[in-house]
């Protein structure tokens, strides 16, 4: 669970203590001893359950790390902000009330207030990057898919992939339940366009289902990782 959700109650009770805790956690992690080893960064995106539940994605983070990659899993809080931000499009084009738009924008500002100190400290750190604003994710995605694509992960999935590429995680696993129609549109459906805009993008869509072959999943992920390792060697040479 993200820091903004875990610490929300603490922040409301004692905001000074919460801000200090956020800064100290980031500084402690930033000062951990590190080696010079370079690993390919692999982002994990997709349907919300399959993305975050290890039992649903066959422990993909453990798999990536065991294969010598650095797994990058975007924040859960951003999905909540995506749900709130959708009210802007609904109010502007689909007949939702202006009141619902105002309330959801207030919720976004509240969550961003919770994350402000952590974001500021991440921006000053040596090894970490601050999370993107949901408004920026929407702007990144809207030239490929409309913000009216709100079924499931909708435009947010496209925005996450673009943000990962911007942060240097050009290798991406798009995890989805078998035959998940929304993901076929905003996940698989946009991969070709993303590759057109970013030729270095190395994206693979993996279907997860009790009847799906785990061997097939593993082979496709390893093929993606093989390409990632080759690209990393080219970059370092």
Question: Where are the model-predicted features located?
Answer:
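Generic beta-strand/beta-sheet core signal
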Residues: 43-47, 72-76, 174-175, 206
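Glycine-rich phosphate/diphosphate-binding loops that line cofactor/substrate pockets in enzymes
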Residues: 30-41, 163-169
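Single conserved hydrophobic/aromatic residue that forms the stacking wall/gate
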Residues: 1-7, 12
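Iron-sulfur (Fe-S) cluster-binding modules
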Residues: 237
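Long, contiguous internal "core" modules enriched in hydrophobic/ aromatic residues
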Residues: 33-34, 45-53
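Short N-terminal or domain-adjacent regulatory/targeting segments
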Residues: 14-35, 154-158
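Hydrophobic alpha/beta core scaffold segments
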Residues: 53-69, 134-234
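Redox- and metal-dependent alpha/beta enzyme cores, enriched for Fe-S-associated oxidoreductases
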Residues: 55-160, 167
């Amino acid at each position: 669970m993200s820091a903004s959700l875990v610490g929300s109650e603490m922040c409301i009770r004692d905001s000074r203590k919460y801000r200090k805790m956020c800064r100290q956690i980031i500084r402690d992690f930033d000062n951990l001893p590190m080696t010079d080893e370079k690993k390919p960064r692999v982002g994990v995106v997709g349907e919300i359950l399959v993305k975050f539940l290890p039992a649903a994605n066959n422990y993909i983070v453990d798999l990536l790390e065991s294969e010598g990659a650095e797994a990058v899993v975007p924040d859960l809080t951003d999905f909540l902000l995506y749900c709130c931000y959708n009210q802007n499009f609904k109010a502007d084009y689909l007949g939702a009330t202006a009141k619902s738009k105002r309330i959801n924008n207030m919720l976004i500002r509240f969550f961003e207030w919770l994350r402000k100190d952590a974001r500021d400290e991440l921006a000053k750190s040596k090894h970490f990057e601050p999370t993107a604003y949901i408004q920026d994710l929407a702007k990144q995605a809207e030239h490929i898919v409309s913000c009216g694509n709100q079924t499931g992960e909708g435009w947010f999935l496209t925005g996450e992939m673009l943000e990962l590429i911007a942060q240097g995680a050009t290798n991406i696993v798009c995890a989805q339940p078998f035959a998940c129609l929304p993901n076929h549109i905003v996940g698989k459906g946009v991969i070709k366009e993303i590759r057109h805009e970013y030729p270095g993008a190395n994206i693979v869509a993996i279907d997860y289902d009790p009847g799906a072959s785990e061997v097939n999943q593993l082979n496709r992920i390893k093929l993606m990782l093989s390409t990632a390792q080759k690209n990393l060697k080219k970059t370092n040479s």
